[in-house]
């Protein structure tokens, strides 16, 4: 939830200004529960339209965030919310209702979630060009801001990492721990 809150605050808007959430939505129990809890807490009963494109594309791992940001931008420019492909019956325990068929309508602001292994989570707010929110502006206007921190995980080489993960083995990085965690310091 912290990534979503930070993205919304950095955009100078409120949760009520979000028209569509591009869910991380992997269809895995733990991920979907975590994302649903965060959305339900942040948005309450005023949840915007939402869907995940992973049912259409699959999980593209490291490329997922970039692909979903592009889908979010296309949603804004085409005023279209993509369907949650492959979802036939949403889990009622999640208390979320994804868009089941493509939905046409005005979409000016999108929150796109990307959650990584080990809690490396990101969220980005994308808005329609030339449509600023008149009552709120970011305190520090920047073309882009990266909020939070992350660390390099795995071996640094996708093939090696995936083989180790498939075997249930630990992944040893190519960088030493001090170098990897340098950006995690509080100061």
Segments from the language model and where they lie:
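Conserved "HGTGT" condensation-loop signature of ketosynthase/thiolase-family condensing enzymes
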Residues: 1-187
